[in-house]
Each structure stands twice: as structure tokens, then as C-alpha cells.
Amino acid sequence: CFGLTESISGSDPSSMETSFEEVSDGFIINGSKNWITNAPIADVYLIWAYSKDKTVHCFLIDKNTKGLTSEKIKKSSIKIAQAGKIFLKNVKVPKNSILPKTNGWKAVYSCINKARYGIAWGAMGAAETCWLIAKEYAQNRIVNKKPIASKQLVQKKLADMMTEISLGFSGCILAG
């Protein structure tokens, strides 16, 4: 799972508080992450942290590493993907746990932008599914011996929905 978001700073990486300190045989990481997708079930974690001089790196950490714990967050929606908190207390990792090319803010924002692109596609798929369900309902819901889909207002609402969805898909295609 991808551990960037924190309770205090949200998804603003420049306000991140999770830190690392270099020691002779690796790094010591301290901090916490919140609202991390799949944290309760992940086998490995990608954890972003900064040093005292504000150098940012991403570390690959095994779930069984001493000092690393996670807990599930109970959610009211999007339950298909679990979310959780990750706690890092004096987590010691070897020097080779730093992912290559993850030095600096450019790497952080590059990951965020790629994630946003994927999230946008997912949202468009969800919107299209909602439209299909609404259309099917309008075709099957009978009022006064006619489907409500025969009403001009319902047709307009469905057409407006599809127009907005098409614009969203176009935006995703242009962004990619």
C-alpha cells in the first residue's frame, strides 16, 4: 500500500511529519499514516518520510518489521477497499529499502498525479454504472401504464448525465 497521507497534514506532502534518520546500517523511521488503502491487509508498505534536512524518500517496508503496526478504519462507504492507519515507532530498515528515484518532492508529486489519473478513471466508471442503473430503472418503472423513461424530463436528466459523463471521459483521455 502507498503511505503518504497523515492525520494532521492530509495529502499535503509538504506538511508530512513522518521522518527518517540515517544510522550506520540503515534508517530509523518514526511517524504515522492515515486513510491508507489496503493498510490492514498489505504485506508490504511504501512509506514516504523526510529527514531533518527535509529530504524526502519512499521506503519499502515489510509488514512484519518490528515497530510497524496497522489498524483498520471502519468506513461507511467504498467498503470494497479497506483503509487503515499505519504506525511506525523506531522502525529500522536496511539501506536498500529506499526505492530508487524517490528522492525529492518531484517524486512525491509524480506519484500523486499518477494516482489522481487512475482515481479519475475509476470515478468515471462509477458514474457510468450509475447512469446505466438509472436508465434501467427508468425503463422498468411503470407509472400510469408507461415507463417513466417515456417522460421528457426523465429523458433530459439521463441525457444530461451522459453528457457530463462523456465530458469526464474526454478529460481523462486528454489527461492521459
Predicted region positions:
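Glycine-rich beta->alpha junctions and the first turn(s) of the following alpha-helix
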Residues: 69-167
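Short loop segments at secondary-structure junctions
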Residues: 23-25, 50-54, 63-66, 89-96
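A short core secondary-structure module
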Residues: 30-71
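A generic structural signal for beta-strand entry/edge sites
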Residues: 24-28, 44, 83
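A structural signal for short hydrophobic beta-strand segments in well-ordered beta-sheet cores
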Residues: 18-21
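A short, Trp-centered hydrophobic/proline-enriched beta-strand micro-motif
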Residues: 1-5
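Short glycine/proline-enriched turns and hinge-like loops at secondary-structure junctions
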Residues: 12-14, 38-42, 80-81
